[in-house]
Amino acid sequence: MNKLVSDGSVKKINYPVLYESGITPPLCEVSAPEPDAGGKRIVAYVYKSSRSTVFENPDIVKTCTVRDLKKDFVNCDEKGEGQ
């Protein structure tokens, strides 16, 4: 799994955006890097938390706490890694 790494190319948008399941994450920031050569755009949902892990599904990267991952996703192990 690729993990999202924060760098200068990531633009943060400070409002919730619907992701694939149609649920809006609470208190989140949305980071949208510029599209790559293939034109795809990776969107990261970042929960306001000191502890965070990355979940990829499959074109969407969601950064949130392990507890929130367990609530939101079924296929998730103790470390919060998506399957």
Curated annotation (Swiss-Prot):
Keyword terms: Plasmid
Domain of life where this protein originates: Bacteria
Official protein name in the record: Protein TrbG
